[in-house]
């Protein structure tokens, strides 16, 4: 209801009864009541207007929020598209920063790898030179040792051949084959025809060396003693006197090889031990035991590094004598 409607006078009734008496106090009360009614209606109208304005304001605020949110989304999307474009072009700051860090790490790893390669190459070259020198030295040592061993073997074979020759000369008479005297009997008439003997002819006499070198040398010395001429007996010596006792045999030493060691004169000798080697002609040599075999030992002279082979039998018979000496 508008304010004009509130202020317009009410329509008069069609047929009104007789007017009552007029009193000024009643008129004032009537005006006061009308004023109260108008003020009440005005307050109601203001409240309705305020409610309507608040509703419109809420709708307007919601529209502004939606519009603002849409604007923020568009701005964010535009920023991401711009960053994507910069990334594809390679001009994005974050991309350049990370690429710079990766490039630095790459260069550092390449430098470390090159240093490691150089270090390993130098180490391999040093090892190669060292191994090459060791191989050359070992080759030269083996060559010298092989030469010495071959010379020693040839010398030993030469001595064996000389001993065989001497043995054949000493035992030549016993090797002569004497004809066997046979008697042929007359064949009886009923005896079968004799079948010729098809047995093989005996092989010519030959020496079978089934003895050790020490035993052979001992036998040779015995033969030499028997072969030497005997002195004639003195005519004044009575026949009943006992004969002069034979020369006492040579002194024998205890010598043997066990577990790669030489046991000689109540002492043990091993490989690489420094010794003195004395021969029967009073020659004293400074030597080192280079190896210990089954029946012999090899010694190396410290003066010229030549090697000699000494048999256990020679040590037992005293042909060579071994003495200890300090390694210095």
Swiss-Prot record:
Cross-link entry Glycyl lysine isopeptide (Lys-Gly) (interchain with G-Cter in SUMO2), positions: 69, 178, 201
Q: Where is this region: Mediates interaction with USP17L2?
A: 2-170
Molecular function (GO) terms for this protein are: histone deacetylase binding; identical protein binding
Function, as annotated, reads: Regulatory protein which represses transcription and augments histone deacetylase activity of HDAC1. May have a potential role in tumor suppressor pathways through regulation of apoptosis. May function in the assembly and/or enzymatic activity of the mSin3A corepressor complex or in mediating interactions between the complex and other regulatory complexes.
What PANTHER family does the database record attribute to this sequence?
BREAST CANCER METASTASIS-SUPPRESSOR 1
According to the record's subunit comment, the protein's assembly and interactions are: Interacts with HCFC1. Homodimer. Component of the SIN3 histone deacetylase (HDAC) corepressor complex. Interacts with SIN3A. Interaction with SIN3B enhances the interaction between SIN3B and HDAC1 to form a complex. Component of a mSin3A corepressor complex that contains SIN3A, SAP130, SUDS3/SAP45, ARID4B/SAP180, HDAC1 and HDAC2. Interacts with USP17L2; the interaction is direct. Interacts with FOXK2.
**Descriptive protein name:** Sin3 histone deacetylase corepressor complex component SDS3
The beginning of the lineage is: Eukaryota, Metazoa, Chordata, Craniata, Vertebrata
Gene for this chain: Suds3
């Amino acid at each position: 209801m508008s304010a004009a409607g509130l202020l317009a006078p009410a329509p008069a009734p069609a047929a009104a009864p007789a007017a009552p008496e007029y009193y000024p106090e009643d008129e004032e009360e009537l005006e006061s009541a009308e004023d109260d009614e108008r003020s009440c209606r005005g307050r109601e109208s203001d409240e309705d207007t305020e409610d309507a304005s608040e509703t419109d304001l809420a709708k307007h605020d919601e529209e502004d929020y939606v519009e603002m949110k849409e604007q923020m989304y568009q701005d964010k999307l535009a920023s991401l598209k711009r960053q994507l474009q910069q990334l594809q072009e390679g001009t994005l700051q974050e991309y350049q920063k990370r690429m710079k860090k990766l490039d630095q790490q790459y260069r550092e790893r390449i430098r470390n790898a090159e240093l490691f390669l150089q270090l390993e190459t130098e180490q391999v070259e040093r090892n190669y030179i060292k191994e090459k020198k060791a191989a050359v030295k070992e080759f030269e040592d083996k060559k010298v040792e092989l030469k010495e061993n071959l010379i020693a073997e040839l010398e030993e074979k030469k001595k064996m051949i000389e001993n065989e020759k001497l043995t054949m000369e000493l035992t030549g008479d016993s090797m002569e084959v004497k004809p066997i005297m046979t008697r042929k009997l007359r064949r009886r008439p009923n005896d079968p025809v004799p079948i010729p003997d098809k047995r093989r002819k005996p092989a010519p006499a030959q020496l079978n060396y089934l003895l050790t070198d020490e035993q052979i040398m001992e036998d040779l010395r015995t033969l030499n003693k028997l072969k030497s001429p005997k002195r004639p007996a003195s005519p004044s010596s009575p026949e009943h006197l006992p004969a002069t006792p034979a020369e006492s045999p040579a002194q024998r030493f205890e010598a043997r090889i066990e577990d790669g060691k030489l046991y000689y004169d109540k002492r043990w000798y091993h490989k690489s031990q420094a010794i003195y080697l004395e021969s029967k002609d009073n020659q004293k040599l400074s030597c080192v035991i280079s190896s210990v075999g089954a029946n012999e030992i090899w010694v190396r002279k410290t003066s010229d590094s030549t090697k000699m082979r000494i048999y256990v039998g020679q040590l037992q018979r005293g042909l060579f004598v071994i003495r200890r000496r300090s390694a210095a």
